[in-house]
Amino acid sequence: MRIRLFLFFMLCADISWSQTFKVDVRMIEVYATVSDSRGRAMTNLHSDDFHVLEDNRLQQIRVFEPQSSAMTIALLVDTTGSMAADLPRVKNAVARLLDAVKPEDNVGLFTFANGLNRLSNFSTDRNTTLKAIFKARAAGQTALFDSVAQLSRQISKDGGKKAILLFTDGDDNSSVLSLEASVKSVQRTGVPIYTVLYGSALKDQRLSQRLEKISVLTGGIPFKVKDAGGVASAFARVGEDMQNMYLLGYQSDSDNQDDWRSIKVTLPNHPKL
């Protein structure tokens, strides 16, 4: 059995270590995906199947959203000048992704160049999002780090399962925040970021490592794709991964004023998995 957890960390059920992370509120949300030894997603789990431990103390789960619950998905598309040649294929891939998400999922479309722009509000109306993406134009410099930090803060204000899907060539030439500061800002919100690296940036190890760091440290998955077909496949994999999320929320019982906690999630009712 394997459990993948994220606010901005990953834990496996078959190893004994855990990572610490920083929180600013007493109600803490933990996202988890659970798979068996063959890598298949475990479905139909309930809140009493999970145990959440903070600093080795069992916590009461107060919020539970199963795999079937709706998600808030923010599509963040790089529309800077460097993406001009690839943007038409990105638009087509986004259209295919919209076919893969569940009808009840709320999807919003954002772009960034010199700053963050909202092209469509969160909605279950896919036609609105489709019309918005095909109006996007490539121009301007790249404020990648600022944009992901700003968007994660915006969508973290609402409850429920949420994620950012970032499509970019990985460059940044106009952000105020550094990569490290941006990642820390996103970590505080608990929003996972899935990154898709495409085009000429695949040949740049520095850009590849940058996007991998953004994804892994926020609980998402990094993807590298070589063509439009690969883009669509990556988007489909992201949609599947997000649909397999469980959301666990608990009220911390700690009186410790230190914001750093160690969290572990187990499935005691399934010892043979």
Predicted regions and their residues:
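Scaffold/interface architecture of coatomer-like assemblies
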Residues: 17-273
